[in-house]
Amino acid sequence: MAKEILFRDEARQRMAKGVNILADAVKVTLGPKGRNVVLEKSFGAPSITKDGVSVAREIELEDKFENMGAQMVKEVASKANDEAGDGTTTATVLAQAFVNEGLKSVTAGMNPMDLKRGIDQAVAAVVEELKKLSTPCDNTKSIEQVGTISANADKSVGEIIAQAMEKVGQEGVITVEEGQSLQNELDVVEGMQFDRGYLSPYFINNQEKMQVELEDPYILLVDKKISNIRELLPALENVAKAGKPLLIIAEDIEGEALATLVVNNMRGIIKCAAVKAPGFGDRRKAMLQDIAILTGGTVISEEVGLSLENASLEDLGTAKKVNIDKENTTIVDGAGQQADIDGRVEQIRKEIENSSSDYDKEKLQERVAKLAGGVAVIKIGAATEIEMKEKKARVDDALHATRAAVEEGVVPGGGVALVRALANVGTIKGDNDEQNAGIALTFRALEMPLRQIAYNAGAEASVIVQEVRNGKGNYGYNAASGEYGDMLEMGILDPAKVTRSALQAAASIAGLMITTEAMVADKPEENAGAGAPDMGGMGGMGGMGGMM
């Protein structure tokens, strides 16, 4: 296919136009008084959002060269979102400022490579200052404030995230689901829960809740399918003599083995239940081992020379309580040694560090949570499905932001941290005037988030930036109330990681765009129908009526 190629200024101008179209749509959402954006859906009602990355993802431009610019800024938003889970709008505003300021300098005849080196030098210095500005976020109040800000000043979201983190700890897994009521709800699962239910409804002993409840049971863990009852009999007899309930977790239990367990349970000879082991393949083996460590038991596996016929009570784990419903099994208060559990958690953490797959990391993190903390589910309440989806996206953002805050601490919010870091950096000198121009344009770009927040709040941006610049420490502008003051005291915080990721992602992509000299795209195809033969002569077929 033939290609269309643009060079120099023409290429950069078309690219900048695409950047500005996308950034202008995204930046209206910034700050406490940011507006909504309505997104058309191919079917069903449109969705309404204040989430920058959701807006960016929807934008595709007709002009291929403009679209390239837009897609590169979309990459900035996605990169910030992937690394910190928030800060996408800030990253987009910064990228737009870097590109526009940079292209002005390039058009004026400056060397793009030196400009980029100046930008990189200034960004590195500002990142170091942000680290110095950050304060630890380790109490419920600051976690609540970060969650509130990230959820667009929705206090209820900040509160529920802080409660969830308090309940399950910072290692715990917090998930967000759509709820059934108008209010947000928090559901905390203590102990280890996995998504496997009872193998037969005949194990149910609490008819009201349709659950199996086992108090102080033995737990038999088997890494294979059980279909022959003779293998199970010795273990069953030992447990029956001890007079305790039994939970069997195996790859599968079927045929006469399952039938015998059901009959013994119904006759009251031994209170028992059976569930499939969670996960598949190697992950199932690892999760069985997790359960063994949590309950103080041993996985009966032929790989390590253990057979089911020779299993003794010492090989079985125990727990204070086990609840099993149709879909989930929850083990509460396993009898495993704390030192063993801590060792296992440390081992899984090392696996997380060495893993390159996001999916594997997420699954490993879930295993850590099940061993060390717990699982909390935030159920989102709303009056309509459209509101529910918008709210869920905001809560997801807020959750990522609070995790980022716990990780790297918090800095003053509302665009103040960048302005303050800028003031603290002092004078940086490049190797030549063009690098100095790159440093200067970075300093101008860093004010843009504060300007945009002020603009969205209907205030005079230049006056506010000057006032904040003249202040010290955490002094800044509260766009929600229109007042100046200490941002930390007013509860306006941003996670340092979010601000840092936004700045680095924006500078990285903008540096590439400034140094672009040519753009190549497919040539638009001519109208395919233009060369087709004229069908006008078919009109004479009207006379065919006489053939009837």
UniProtKB/Swiss-Prot annotation:
Coiled-coil segments on the chain, per record: none
Coarse class of the protein's main subcellular location: cytoplasm
Enzyme category, top tier: isomerase
Origin: domain of life: Bacteria
InterPro entries linked: Chaperonin_Cpn60_CS, Cpn60/GroEL, Cpn60/GroEL/TCP-1, GroEL-like_apical_dom_sf, GROEL-like_equatorial_sf, TCP-1-like_intermed_sf
Function: Together with its co-chaperonin GroES, plays an essential role in assisting protein folding. The GroEL-GroES system forms a nano-cage that allows encapsulation of the non-native substrate proteins and provides a physical environment optimized to promote and accelerate protein folding.
Family: Belongs to the chaperonin (HSP60) family.
Assembly with partners or alone: Forms a cylinder of 14 subunits composed of two heptameric rings stacked back-to-back. Interacts with the co-chaperonin GroES.
Identification of the protein by name: Chaperonin GroEL
Organism the protein comes from: Alcanivorax borkumensis (strain ATCC 700651 / DSM 11573 / NCIMB 13689 / SK2)
